[in-house]
């Protein structure tokens, strides 16, 4: 059976259902006419993705889209059914995944590697697969298998590209399956590496990226290693500088800040800028929340073990609390009761919740919970240090 599947993946004419469903679509929308099935699929996928993102009428017929989804799901379930990926990543599979191939033959193992460690052609083919899964979560075999129960319970009515985001919304549930959470976190980390793998952010911030981050696009888009978090970091810095971002982009950047606050690896710039400080914090603490808090305390005490770039980035992480309190899980958790009590009528975002807590802490007639007051006091002190670091950096720049 696998041999026949491999044959049909190599030549689209051997895949009879696909041929019947998509023949006219291929003739109408794929010029010059591709011969390899991988090129046919890529052509159709790009057409479907463009129409979905731009919210316009689909050029590809419904029957062809359904068959295309089936073909993609097959391809993503086993590397042997993706000849182009298997060939491009042959050496990397041997080097990194010889003992960790799993049921999919090594696809997830390859995704776990840092982009720079993979050969350029392998990274290129793997990125194509990641894009397909980001634009249509129903072709993400590992996500569907690992989160089957959670998708059925929480996200069965969602559009295919919304499933991952829907799962993220419910992942705070204590009963959330750990196997599913592991896959979910892995996808969040992938998105953080390259903004093009986050279709919502890519769509919402397209004009903002052109306006503020075009130098990064020009420098890194042909490098083969993706953007390594640089585009999102550029947009975060733009937001922290109070420069005008489109409303939809600003919302996406806040969501990204929250992701990075909950999952340290979802901040590739932090990983790259603060390796020694992270090494120390990870040797002492286990959870992402505690590791992040460890970095902030080291920053406040002037004890970060890396250079100025690390100090600058941690200062921005501290400053992000002023942008949205959800970007600081420790403060948000410690002050949950007080936020409901004193700030329930304050609109979230733009530092309003943080400002509300600070205002309440100064009122003699109100008393914050002890833990909230303690964490808030530390944050105010950290914020003062962060403002000085960022101001000094601006002078040097």
Model-derived regions, located:
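Mature extracellular/luminal domains of secreted and GPI-anchored eukaryotic proteins, especially small
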Residues: 1-397
């Amino acid at each position: 059976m696998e041999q026949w599947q491999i044959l049909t993946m190599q030549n689209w004419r051997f895949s009879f259902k696909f041929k019947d469903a998509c023949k006219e679509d291929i003739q109408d929308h794929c010029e010059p006419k591709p011969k390899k099935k991988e090129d046919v699929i890529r052509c159709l996928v790009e057409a479907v993705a463009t129409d979905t993102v731009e919210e316009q009428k689909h050029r590809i017929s419904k029957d062809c889209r359904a068959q295309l989804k089936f073909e993609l799901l097959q391809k993503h379930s086993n590397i042997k059914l993706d000849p182009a990926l298997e060939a491009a990543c042959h050496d990397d599979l041997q080097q990194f995944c010889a003992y960790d191939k799993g049921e999919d033959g090594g696809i997830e193992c390859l995704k776990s590697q840092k982009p720079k460690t993979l050969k350029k052609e392998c990274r290129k083919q793997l990125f194509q697969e990641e894009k397909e899964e980001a634009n249509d979560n129903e072709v993400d075999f590992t996500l569907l298998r690992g989160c089957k129960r959670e998708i059925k319970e929480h996200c069965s009515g969602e559009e295919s590209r919304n499933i991952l985001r829907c799962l993220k919304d419910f992942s705070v549930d204590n009963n959330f399956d750990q196997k599913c959470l592991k896959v979910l976190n892995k996808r969040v980390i992938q998105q953080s590496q390259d903004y093009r793998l986050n279709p919502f952010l890519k769509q919402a911030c397209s004009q903002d990226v052109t306006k503020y981050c075009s130098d990064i696009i020009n420098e890194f888009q042909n490098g083969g290693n993706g953007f390594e978090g640089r585009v999102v970091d550029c947009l975060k810095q733009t937001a922290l500088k109070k420069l005008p971002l489109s409303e939809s982009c600003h919302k996406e950047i806040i969501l990204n800040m929250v992701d990075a606050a909950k999952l340290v690896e979802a901040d590739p710039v932090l990983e790259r800028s603060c390796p020694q400080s992270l090494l120390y914090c990870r040797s002492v603490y286990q959870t992402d929340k505690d590791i992040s808090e460890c970095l902030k305390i080291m920053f406040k005490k002037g004890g970060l073990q890396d250079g100025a770039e690390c100090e600058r980035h941690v200062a921005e992480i501290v400053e992000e609390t002023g942008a949205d309190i959800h970007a600081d899980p420790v403060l948000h958790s410690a002050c949950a009761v007080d936020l409901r009590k004193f700030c329930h009528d304050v609109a979230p975002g733009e530092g309003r919740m943080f400002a509300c807590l600070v205002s309440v802490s100064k009122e003699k007639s109100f008393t914050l919970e002890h833990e909230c007051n303690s964490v808030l006091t530390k944050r105010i002190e950290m914020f003062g240090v962060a403002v000085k670091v960022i101001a000094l950096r601006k002078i040097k720049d």
